[in-house]
Regions:
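C-terminal helical subdomain
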Residues: 211, 230-295
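The beta1-alpha1 cofactor-binding region of Rossmann-like NAD(H)/NADP(H)-dependent oxidoreductases
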Residues: 51-52, 72-84, 128
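Catalytic loop of short-chain dehydrogenase/reductase
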Residues: 104-108, 115-130, 134, 143, ...
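Canonical Rossmann dinucleotide-binding motif of NAD(H)/NADP(H)-dependent dehydrogenases/reductases
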Residues: 3-40
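Conserved Rossmann-fold SDR core element
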Residues: 26, 94, 158-161, 192-219, ...
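A glycine-rich helix->loop->beta "capping" turn
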Residues: 5, 64-67, 87-107, 119, ...
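Rossmann-fold cofactor-recognition segment
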Residues: 59-78
């Protein structure tokens, strides 16, 4: 029997990126996974043509031994989110895990190159639309998904909510300005505080709320950016990790009977890899990304 067989998960933002890796790892562990996000085979695609759909991810979840259920959901539209969780309740009768990896930061730019060229400029020389893209398809998306998930979990007296973040350093795990992206930093700081406060209110109901800090992930968009050896060297691509690494961290948390002890904290994926004994897709242990420590 697989460790998460019979468990029900919703992964928000899993057509690509960290969310896709999380969905696949949950599938490896045997979970029923609602693969959700804005990009489906039938429907609009991102402006920068980033690959991936909820349908593709769901099919791979099933192929890996779980059950993938694709649902197109725009997490900036509350009615769509409410309908998703009502469907989960109707079809499964419970929800064990919510993993949120929604991120609309790329929506403010016409292409991957445009995003990279904007990085490092002062905020007044970057598109003001970033605020809406990153705060709405970011902090609000995490809130509204958690809102409906927590209702189901509180009624059951248990559950796990996981979020993905960026912009923390060192053992103190305190938010710090990353340099070159004011709205990016603000959006992630908002997510961090949101998750910490949700943890306080969720703990009496045995709902663990945990934030994960990955290293430099090989997402589809990152791979679109890394076009030259010079750029790979600049970003220390040799220290990057697949999105399955953070996925295995979520699967480990979901299988941990003492997970409530970790609630309200930001955890490095690398630390959980040590604790739970998992590696990246290629068998390597990837340490905490040194660029995070040096910022």
């Amino acid at each position: 029997m697989k460790p998460l067989e019979g468990k029900v998960a919703v992964v928000a933002g899993s057509s690509r990126g960290a969310g896709r890796g999380i969905a696949l790892a949950l599938g490896d562990a045997g979970a029923i996974v609602y693969v959700t996000g804005r990009t489906a085979r039938a429907g609009p695609k991102p402006a920068d043509a980033a690959p991936g759909t909820v349908d593709d991810t769901a099919e791979e979840v099933t192929a890996r031994g779980g059950k993938g259920i694709p649902v197109r959901v725009d997490y900036t539209v509350e009615a769509e989110v409410a309908a998703l969780f009502e469907r989960v309740k109707r079809e499964q009768g419970k929800l064990d895990v919510l993993a949120s990896a929604v991120w609309g930061g790329a929506d403010a730019f016409a292409s991957a190159d445009a995003w990279m060229s904007a990085w490092g400029k002062p905020f007044w020389d970057q598109p003001s639309r970033q605020w809406q893209c990153m705060m709405t398809a970011g902090a609000f998306a995490y809130f509204i998904a958690g809102y409906y998930a927590a209702r189901m979990m509180a009624a059951a007296g248990k559950g796990l909510i996981v979020g993905v973040t960026d912009g923390i350093v060192g053992e103190a795990k305190t938010p710090e300005y990353g340099g070159g992206q004011l709205v990016w930093d603000l959006a992630h700081a908002s997510i961090n505080r949101l998750m910490q406060d949700m943890a306080i209110e969720g703990k009496p109901h045995h709902i663990a709320v945990i934030t994960l800090m990955p290293g430099f992930m090989q997402t589809e968009r990152v791979l679109m950016h890394m076009k030259t050896e010079e750029m790979k060297k600049m970003f220390r691509f040799d220290l990057s990790e697949s999105t399955l690494y953070i996925g295995r961290a979520v699967a480990g948390l979901a299988a941990d009977p003492q997970v409530l002890e970790k609630t309200g904290k930001i955890h490095f994926v690398a630390e959980l890899a040590r604790e739970y004994g998992f590696t990246d897709a290629d068998g390597r242990f990837i340490p905490k990304w040194e660029c995070v420590e040096a910022r």
